[in-house]
């Protein structure tokens, strides 16, 4: 699927864009249209937990409830399947004790726990807000490989330009209320943006020349 990196200076609405896609916030105008039965996983920049969980409960048990809220037999089968995969992901993110209480975690550990839950969710679309925050180099390299092999669509906000360049195949730039899209990685985006700005300057120069001629005509 597409792996889209969302970039722009702070305050331009990158995180808000992810929240709108996730359905956490509503648009002031217009509509966001999603296909039916699409599963979306959202990693906020600062995760908030609605109650006390152990790491296992949040990453595995809550995941099972989302997938099959009513069927106990199916839930047990899915839980058995997810447990092994969850342990692999958690281990890669630096966790060894799946019974640990999340309320005792640091902010960085909470972010990694929320990331693990997103990656395990089997979603069609991953929305990740600064996923490499609090990750060391080994964890970042592992996440890069995971996302490259991920079959769904990815929309990601990150200030890690190197990670962005390696993972994403499309760039969406939020700039002064506009969204510019580029079918390329970050390196290609820099080149295409430079071309767009050069073209804009050329157009501005042409408009300025027209205005100068108008002024000259008025002064005759």
Regions found by a protein language model. Give the residues of each.
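ABC ATP-binding cassette signature C-motif
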Residues: 1-205
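Short cytosolic helices in intracellular loops of multi-pass membrane proteins
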Residues: 205-220
């Amino acid at each position: 699927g597409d792996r889209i990196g969302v970039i722009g200076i702070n305050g331009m609405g990158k995180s808000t864009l992810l929240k709108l896609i996730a359905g956490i916030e509503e648009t002031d105008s217009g509509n966001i249209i999603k296909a039916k039965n699409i599963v979306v996983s959202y990693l906020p920049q600062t995760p908030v937990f609605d109650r006390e969980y152990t790491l296992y409960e949040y990453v595995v048990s809550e995941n099972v409830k989302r997938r099959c809220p009513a069927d106990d037999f199916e839930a047990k089968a899915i839980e058995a399947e997810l447990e092994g995969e969850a342990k692999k992901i958690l281990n890669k993110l630096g966790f060894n004790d799946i019974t640990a209480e999340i309320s005792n975690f640091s902010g960085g550990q909470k972010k990694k726990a929320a990331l693990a839950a997103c990656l395990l969710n089997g979603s069609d679309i991953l929305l990740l807000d600064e996923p490499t925050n609090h990750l060391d180099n080994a964890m970042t390299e592992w996440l890069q490989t995971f996302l490259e092999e991920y079959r769904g669509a990815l929309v990601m906000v990150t200030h890690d330009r190197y990670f962005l360049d390696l993972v994403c195949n499309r760039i969406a730039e939020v700039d002064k209320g506009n969204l510019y899209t580029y079918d390329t990685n970050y390196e290609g985006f820099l080149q295409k943006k430079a071309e767009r700005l050069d073209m804009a300057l050329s157009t501005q120069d042409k408009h300025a020349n027209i205005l100068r001629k108008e002024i000259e005509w008025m002064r005759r």
